[in-house]
């Protein structure tokens, strides 16, 4: 596993916010990942679908960013630092904290001293938040 400070037990957690940093260029990426995939399956003879929860590929996950994954293949995974920033207990908390981290770090505009982009993020998710959602967010 390549994650720094991974949780030992993920059963009661929903997901995490992460930062991946290229040690060669100093560029980073801020993203999110769920610990489990949850699907509803139809079962023969039953009216309602059954919820199936299984652990995701989070231990070996690198990113959904095509550019970042290309860089990892080119430079080797050992040249990247994978840090878990926050653990979350709900989808709302996961979405909120990812957006908050991306806005606070100004991932779309921040530059390194040499003028290159500091973050590889190309967008910030458009997620609707309201006071009710923000009040429900609890830090783990």
Residue ranges and their predicted role:
Residues 1-11, 86-140:
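Boundary/linker segments flanking structured domains
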Residues 1-42, 136-140:
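GIY-YIG nuclease catalytic motif and its immediate N-terminal context
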Residues 14-16, 72, 120:
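Generic hydrophobic, helix-prone segments enriched in Leu/Val/Ile
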Residues 22, 33, 62-65, 123, ...:
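Generic alpha-helical secondary structure signal
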Residues 34-91:
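Conserved short loop/helix modules at catalytic or binding sites
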